[in-house]
Amino acid sequence: MTRLDFRNLLHEIWLKSDTDFSGVGIIVCDTPICLPIMNLRGDSPAISGTTAEVLSHLSRTESKYHDGFHIINQMGLITHIAQYFSPPIVLNVNIDRSRPIGGRFTAAIFGSAIPGVLMTGIVSEGHGLSIFENGHETLFETLK
C-alpha cells in the first residue's frame, strides 16, 4: 500500500461517513503480533463490504467498535478491529501544536515509529486527515 493508496482509503472512509462519525485511527502493518495492542471489545463484528465501507460503518458513534485503532495489512485488508494502541513515547517527534491534537494523533505519530508499522493514519472532523510514517507526519489535509 502506498501513501496515496492509504490517503485515498482514509478519504473514502470520511466521504462514506455519516453525521455521527467518531473519527478513525488505522495502522498499516503485516505483523500485528509486534504491536502494543489489546482488543477493546473481546469480539469482532462480521465484516462484509469494502474496507472503506466497513471502517466507515464501524466509525459511527453508535457502533461499539468505534474506539481504538483498526489494523489493516499492506493489501488493505482488515486484520484487527477496535484495538487499544499504546505505543511508547518518541521523545524527538516534531508535533505541530498549532492544530488541535489529542490521544489518537499522538498514538498514531508515536506508533508509526514502531518497527513493522508501514504507516498510521487518522481522520476526524476537528482535525482533518493525517498520515504518519517513521515518527513523522507525512501528509495532512483539511477536510471539507
Regions found by a protein language model. Give the residues of each.
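Divalent-cation
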Residues: M1-K144
